[in-house]
Amino acid sequence: MKLLSLCSVLLFSLVLLLIPNSPDNVQVQGNHLLVNNSPYYIKGICYHPVPKGQTIRDFQTIDQDLELMKEAGINTIRVYAPIDDIQVLDKIDAAGLKLIVGFGYNQNGVFDILSETYLDYIKKYKDHNAILIWELGNEYNYHPEWFGGDIINWYNALSVATDQIHDIDPNHPVATAHGDMPDKQALASNPNIDIWGLNVYRWDQPQSVFKEWQTVSDKPVYLSEAGADSYMKISKAGFKQGENQRAQAVANAKIIDAVLDRSDVASGIFIFSFTDGLWKAGNPDQQDIGGWAPNSSGVPYDGAPNEEYWGIVDINRNKKETFEVIKNKFLNFLIDKNN
């Protein structure tokens, strides 16, 4: 009898091991993002780790990076291209973080929208627990030249892609990352987008975008990019020219406060970005000033996006002053579940 009981226990345990764990339930309800039927507030970071001296993304520091993210109270990572590495995805999930996966339009046939290979990625990973949202494009509204000079070509492709994802994965919302506020054409062309991401650089006061959003949509919205760099091209607003971590910290504090204060509308914020990107503006072996980004005159406090100075940590993972600011804001914020 004891042997029979032991066999039964072992058999039951084996069955449990063979049954895959169900991923968290992610859905949109009203203007809120829900995970397992509870409001989920994005305390996010944009993440594109390119090592010093290289130009291609590499996850060799993923363990260290995840520890730093957790310390800072970050719960969501936003990447600009799919991560086709189950070990990296498993580590993100094991760390208790969620992931917004971005798909580009034309990435030479690598999980992109043009070739429809992005659907292969979604089919492969749609049941992975790390996945929060599928995100299509990144501020493409600034680049009609990529679509034959007519941005409606992008909006049409976006609409088709949204419907295709809904057909194969009804369990994750579909988003797009739009450069600031979408106009009537963008909204009318994409009625099936579940949640909108907005890349917003309005100095250190992004809150006006939420009032504008409420006048045009009742769908949930998050800031897919916001923040400041740590280099002042000129002296301004009391901040000295040159590398200035204090300016970045002050700006990010005000930006985060402005978003958290509108948690009744905003589903969260992604600070741009986790680490400095030495590959962006010159020699990838050294940190250069300069670089360029569209519609970037609203970058605090000099109106100049020094592209290699955006990290909350530097290339060697040393914490900048803004790290502690973000940590304090994120760890001390709890979503009001009655909103």
Language-model regions, residue ranges each:
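A structural motif corresponding to the C-terminal end of an alpha-helix
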Residues: 72, 124-129, 161-172, 258-266, ...
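Active-site mouth of glycoside hydrolases
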Residues: 28, 34-42, 46-196, 206, ...
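Aromatic-rich peripheral "rim/lid" segments of glycoside hydrolase catalytic domains that contact
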Residues: 272-339
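Glycoside hydrolase catalytic-domain groove-lining segments
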Residues: 173, 185-240, 266
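Positively charged n-region of N-terminal signal peptides that target proteins for export
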Residues: 1-5
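Active-site clefts of carbohydrate-active enzymes
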Residues: 141-147, 217-255, 271-283
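Bacterial Sec-dependent signal peptides at the C-terminal "C-region" and cleavage site
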Residues: 10-25
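Soluble or luminal CAZymes and related metallo-dependent hydrolases
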Residues: 61, 113-117, 153-157, 205, ...
